[in-house]
Each structure stands twice: as C-alpha cells, then as structure tokens.
Amino acid sequence: MHDIEILRPDLPRGHFRFVLFDFDGTLSLIREGWPQVMIPMMVDVLRQTGTGEDEVTLRAQVEEFVMRLNGKQTIYQMMQLGEEVKKRGGQALDPLVYKHRYHDLLMARIEGRIEALAAGQATPEDWTVPGSHALLKNLQSRGLTLYLASGTDLPFVRREAELLGLTVYFGAHIYGALDDYQNFSKKMVIERLLEDNKLRGEELLGFGDGFVEIEEVRRAGGVAVAVASDEANRRGVHAWKRARLIRAGADIVIGDYRQQGPLVDYLLTDSPLAGKQSSHG
C-alpha cells in the first residue's frame, strides 16, 4: 500500500485557508479500540430481544450501522440501536441510557491511558497518530487556521486534546458533541466556517477517518484527506477503513502523517508529489 494515494489527480490545490480535523482516529488514539466496546455491547442488547438471528448476522448488521454513522455524534449510533431493538419487537431504552452504558464500558478500557498521560508516564506521541504534531505545526506555520470537530462529547474532546498537547494548534476552534445534539454536527461546523470566513469550497481542507467528515468536506466543495489509520499497529493503511473512506469520496488516502512534509507541499503548492505515491484517474 502506498504512503500517499491520490484518488483525484485534478483536485484544486494551493488555495487552502482553513483545515478541519476530526479527532479520534485522525489525531488521537486515546479511544483506540472503541468499536470493540460498542459493537459487542449493541449485539448483547439486540440478543436480549429474543431475536432468532445468530451472532454473526447480528454482528454484521451492528458493524454496518456503527461504522456508517462513525463521525457523527455517538448519540446517533445509540438512536439507531433503539430502532434495531424496536424492529425485533423489543422495548428500546432512551438513547442516552445506551450512550452512558457504552461510555462507562469505554472508560474502563481507556482510563489507564488518560491517567498515564495526566501523570506524565505516557507522552502525547504515544497516543497520537504518528506525525500529528509535525503536521499541525507545519500547517499552522504556513498561516492556515485549524479547526477540530469531533463526534465525542465536547468536555472529553477538550480534556483529551489538552493532554495530547493539541490545544495550542486549535485555540478556541474545538467543537464536539453537545447534550442538545441537534445544535451540533460536522455539517454545521463546516457551514459556519465557510459563512463566517467568506470561504469558497476549494479553500477548505479536511482530514478524517470517518465516513461523515469525508462526505461533508466533499459536499462543501473542499478537499478531503482520508486518514485510514491502523490504530492498533500505528503503521500502514487499514484496508477496511480505506475502502469505506474511498466510498465516502476521499480525494487522498494516507495511513498516518509520517510523510506530512511532501503531502503539505503537494497540497499547498502546484508542485508534483515527491516520494512514494499512486494515482487513480
């Protein structure tokens, strides 16, 4: 697999003023493994409806909607879970109940990582996609304004970004899920960003590992870099993520930011891409 895969060779380059980043899986690895928490929890909930479906079928169905909604606020995945319970004749709980159950299970998995970062026993580099800090520093030094928008609840995003030494790059432009979920979406952040800054679509660059942000950046006329990060191994491209993100409309696919220098040069100038790459017409 190539380090930088160009899927739209004629993409508009050199005009970017603002860059939008997703958080989990795009910059932060603190929540690495979240699907292994969410999917079994949901399969368990659906099994309790008394459905006749086997484990493999249930898991495939849950995985499909969980990953399709990845990038939106977590509550949407829980709302879909409620719909799936009803479809099977079960009594659905409030989506917030499911969300809190999931969050408790996830925290049991990741609280050691957060504590290690807070105590200085782990470094930000241990829990970020390789090359994240270098990329953000490079973009900021070239005068671009950076935004962070996450489907994770805002207080957690702020805390985890701070622990990872990322707040300095985004300042006040850190957005996350709100209790009143209808008042936040990545689409809303993008629309406000374009409107407030009188931006044309080609002046927006986006980085993300979720279907939603890739789709929304492209819809706005921006350029979408899909970060198909292999979060567990921290190297290379995750083939399943790559396939999904290409379907979402990715312009470029990378696995991490080890090649951020040539990538940024390519995006911000009209020079050809240096180094290892592949192009698809």
Give the location of each predicted region.
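Acidic, Mg2+-coordinating phosphoryl-transfer loop and its flanking beta/alpha structural elements
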Residues: 150, 206-252
